[in-house]
Amino acid sequence: MSQLYDYIIIGAGSAGCVLANRLSKNPKNSVLLLEAGGPDNNMNIHIPGAYLKVHKSKNDWGFWTEKQVNVLNRKIYLPRGKTLGGSSSTNAMAYVRGNAADYDGWAELGNSGWSYKDLLPYFKRSENHEQFDAMDSGYHSNSGELGVTLPIRFQTPYVEGFIDACDAIGIPANLDYNGAIQEGASLVQSTIKNGKRESGATAFLKPVLDRNNLTAISNAFVEKIIFDGKKAVGVQYKKGVKTIQVKAQKEIILSAGAYQSPQLLMLSGIGEASELKKHGIDCVHESKGVGKNLQDHLFYPICAQSKTQEGINHYISPLKQLKAAWNYFVHKKGVFCTSPLEGMAFFDLDQKGGKVNFQLHFSPISMGNEYGYDAYDLYDYPRVDGFTILPTLLHPKSRGTVSLSSSNPKEAPIIQPNFLKEKEDLDQLVKGGKLVFKIMEEQALKNYTKVSGLPYNRTSEDLLIEHIKKTLETVYHPVGTCKMGNDEMAVVDPTLKVYGIKNLRVVDASIMPKIVSGNTNAPVFMIAEKAADMILKTKL
């Protein structure tokens, strides 16, 4: 006999962990949380400075794009967290809410209740900001579960040079990009608490695992959602060699992320009918937008060598790592306490006071002169200190798709993001790179710089384009593949219910109709907070 729960949540990422916490707060609600990955017991997950060591490990789905015809036919690596906490356990820990105009734009598309004014309380509900007293309390909180902090336990002098150099060219210094004004150059705010990574699992899930009405199962690979007609009634998952079916009497909530939520919908019979037929899957409900509208942020590195050994690269040597580890475990200070990011800048690339459309990530790590490295392998990096500025395209025009490779749930989906398909995307990245050159020429950064902007001739746009295509990476912020809206390509309505199906919602980054102006983890926590409220208010 199948076990019966009120709510079944598929995926213990940022959204799933919030939902498990909020829905199980009422002891009358029985909640099951299913996660395909294992427990988050890899020590490297919890040490911010060990960020790169969790990629291409058992805690990473390790997806790849199809060959990108506009990026030298490269297949581009797509890390995705496969553990409790999902990608919040493997990401670079940046806490960025985006721009108020992003959410007002969602509301203008017909998504009532999704304006920035509507959503700010949900951002605040989760947050426990370590520097709350220095922030505007109208935008921040110190009473939530999610630890957020500025880089106070380790900081290089390079980031102050970056902020001052940005200020010198017209991108003003800004204490708080998550406050009233996003524009400007700032220290990064990170999901770190007491020197340890703060993930969805550590903040929301683990503190409530002792609730009798909450069951969390790891290594539970969901194969399909079960329907009775057009009503979602259960889930089938694999645990080892055993196939298990469980039933939900209230709702099933899909929080598997922008690649796997559409994949699971299609495997379960919801998607474009022709796509389902191709793989021999019976169509439960045709929804043409499933897997469409894929958007992601893109960036590439521009590096500099520094005059001094005040960065991070020299810590790569084994002896330095031992010393840093001692400082971390004994004093909770030093390089292991920090994310790979120290600074951010947000601005209108045309610098005409328009909407934020571009971002710079600043890292106190040099990626070397020739960029002939694996960006996800720390030991590929040079031992010479420096810094990297990464021009980041916030609002790509190109759109991609997620589709099935087969009807086998174990096979990865086909991910075709169509990077740089629209020429405007490349033009923006070129323009952003030229702006970085200007920043590097400012004395505030030149004070620390031995050699900047390697390895190409800055006067040649062709060489810059070649460099972009050679080094371009995703910031792994995929969104939009189960978009919210009221048009024919919308998969969910503004309450995140799947159109045409009862008792099924999608709650993760896939519901974003348009990508936000910044890193996407903070918005996913917010989406889950709002979804939990809507679910609990639903009369069944």
Describe the predicted segments one by one.
Residues 1-540:
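N-terminal redox-cofactor-binding region of secreted/periplasmic oxidoreductases
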